[in-house]
Swiss-Prot record:
Keywords linked to the UniProt accession: Deoxyribonucleotide synthesis, Iron, Metal-binding, Oxidoreductase
Physiological role: Provides the precursors necessary for DNA synthesis. Catalyzes the biosynthesis of deoxyribonucleotides from the corresponding ribonucleotides.
Quaternary structure, from the entry: Tetramer of two alpha and two beta subunits.
Active site per database record: Y125
GO annotation, cellular component aspect: ribonucleoside-diphosphate reductase complex
Protein name per UniProt: Ribonucleoside-diphosphate reductase subunit beta
PANTHER family from the UniProt entry: RIBONUCLEOSIDE-DIPHOSPHATE REDUCTASE SMALL CHAIN (PTHR23409), RIBONUCLEOSIDE-DIPHOSPHATE REDUCTASE SUBUNIT M2 (PTHR23409:SF18)
Gene giving rise to this polypeptide: nrdF
Length: 339
């Protein structure tokens, strides 16, 4: 093993080369020499789960969409545009910055993959819009995002930590976006799906959620590996930071959800759904959830939406119990193209 790693110790990754003022000989990522087996495990999972929104038959939701009032249509469009903003931030700043702070060469490329898939998530909402919404509805929703202060505050809150000098705080912030902030928006499609509305759209959200679960798990794992090397004092300091930031975001989230969902009868349940996932996020970092059962009580029909057709072990690509459709190819002849 010593000889196997000799070249590794005498070289730098391309990222290290750029960070160290262009010093040293470059090495390539070697998937046959993995220091942390979790890297390989997560890489295999995220590549096995690869999907694209164009494969989901969202057009099957058009009849359901037309049955909704304009108020509900506008709410859905605003909610998904808000989610698009968060995924835009995560794809272009949050996950990209984690490459700089990676512990292994493999972690670098995993976060590059995460950034790409979050870009796919942002594109997915565009697929929903182009299928269900008018151009006017889409434009109005994007204008609403720019002008809505409660949304802007929560969207901007994590960016200073992404780009700051503390790698661990950046890691926490990058995990908070997919681990907590998105769930208030996720509540709406699950609520609708539990009432037999927009089922294919909800399937897209389940696929996004499946990716987020892996993302959160991996970021939490890497966070814990770094924290365990710190002194007790530093560990306590980091815990205070995590909880303080979480409570700050919860207040921002409550303000946003109250404004977004006002008049639709789902504000309190959406907040409980968010806080439930805040507790899950903290557990993922190795901390106990401080929230009570009452604060995190989710209705059974919403829990059913989280599990039905969305279990991480489910074969989304089989077409069984999911709307993910794979194309079937057929050889053609010249005459087939004579229209």
């Amino acid at each position: 093993m010593a000889n196997t790693k000799k070249y590794f110790l005498e070289s730098v990754s391309p990222l290290e080369y750029a960070q160290k003022k262009f010093q040293g000989n470059l090495r390539s990522v070697n998937w046959n020499l993995v220091d942390d087996e979790k890297d390989l495990e997560v890489w295999n999972r995220i590549t096995q789960n690869f999907w694209l929104p164009e494969k989901i038959p969202v057009s099957n939701d058009i009849p359901s969409w037309k049955q909704l009032s304009k108020e509900w249509q506008d709410l859905i469009t605003k909610t998904f545009t808000g989610l698009t903003l968060l995924d835009t931030i995560q794809a272009t700043i949050g996950d990209i910055k984690q490459i700089d702070y990676a512990l292994t060469d493999h972690e670098q490329v995993i976060y590059a993959n995460f950034a790409f898939m979050v870009g796919v998530h942002a594109r997915s909402y565009g697929t929903i819009f182009s299928t269900l919404c008018t151009s006017e509805q889409i434009t109005e929703a994007h204008e609403w995002v720019v002008k809505t202060e409660s949304l802007q505050k929560r969207a901007k809150a994590l960016i200073p930590y992404y780009t700051g000098k503390d790698p661990l705080k950046s890691k926490v912030a990058a995990a908070l976006m997919p681990g907590f902030l998105l769930y208030g928006g996720f509540y709406l499609p699950f609520y609708l799906s539990s009432r037999k509305q927009l089922p294919n759209t909800s399937d897209i959200i389940r696929l996004i959620l499946r990716d987020k679960v892996i993302h959160n798990y991996y970021s939490g794992y890497k966070f814990q590996r770094k924290v365990e090397k710190m002194s007790k004092e530093k560990q306590a300091e980091m815990k205070r930071f995590v909880f303080d930031l979480m409570y700050e975001l919860i207040e921002l989230e409550k303000a946003y959800l109250k404004e977004l969902y006002e008049g639709f009868g789902i504000v309190e349940d959406a907040i409980k759904f968010s806080i439930y996932n805040a507790g899950k996020f903290l557990q993922n970092l190795g901390y106990d959830s401080p929230f009570t059962e009452e604060e995190t009580r989710i209705k059974p029909e919403i829990f059913a939406q989280l599990s039905a057709r969305a279990d991480e072990n489910h074969d989304f690509f089989s077409g069984n119990g999911s709307s993910y459709v794979m194309g079937i190819s057929e050889e053609t002849e010249d005459k087939d193209w004579d229209f």
